[in-house]
Amino acid sequence: AALDYWGGKNVITCGMYRNAEDRDKIRTLTKNDVTFSFLGFTDHTNGLRIAEDSELEVVYTSDEAEIQKEITEASKISDMVVVSVHWGTENSHTINDAQRALAQKMCDWGANIIIGTHPHVIQGVEELTAADGRKTLVAYSLGNFISAQDVNSRMIGGMLDFDIRKSYEKNTVTYENVKFIPVVTHYDYSFSNIRIYPFSDYTKELASKHGVNAKSPFSYDFIVQTLKDNISDKYLDLN
């Protein structure tokens, strides 16, 4: 159903495929003479399994040979390889060893940007160096962009913002000016009127009235501290 819905929109999807042939078609987008490839992998599917007689395809993080193949192929046809990975420990700000190990491997294989999902809470942003000296930007978890959950830390998410620069003289494409822009999911009593605020537009008054306070204490200062505890000042943009 999800593939049918998004298939009718002007949206690039990756991570779930109709069959093996569809999986092998790397999704690309070219803008301003820069070609991006988009790949998606997952540690698990939240207890759901693909039926044995289904042709649907998902690439799991345990299948490192397939991941390496896809990143390598994507590198050949694009300037920037963007990888989305569903991984990490749920509800934990701590980046686990498996995340770090796979991130470094994907960096070495040719990924340029790695964006993590799944933990529901934010995790750190850092830059890795590949064996050949290339740099790879990794945001281990952007947290929840929007949710109807009832834990304070799950109300805080982020957007990753950066510029892409192409040098015709050096024949290189790089990212620069990386920013982690925080967002806050806000709802009223009993999960009503859910909306999203950029942190720059959020206020102490809104935080004091957040419906999550019924289950989990929430405040403006809590948001700031959570962000500063997990996102390097090098990337954190609170303005």
Sequence positions of predicted segments:
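Acidic, metal/ion-coordinating pockets
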Residues: 1-239
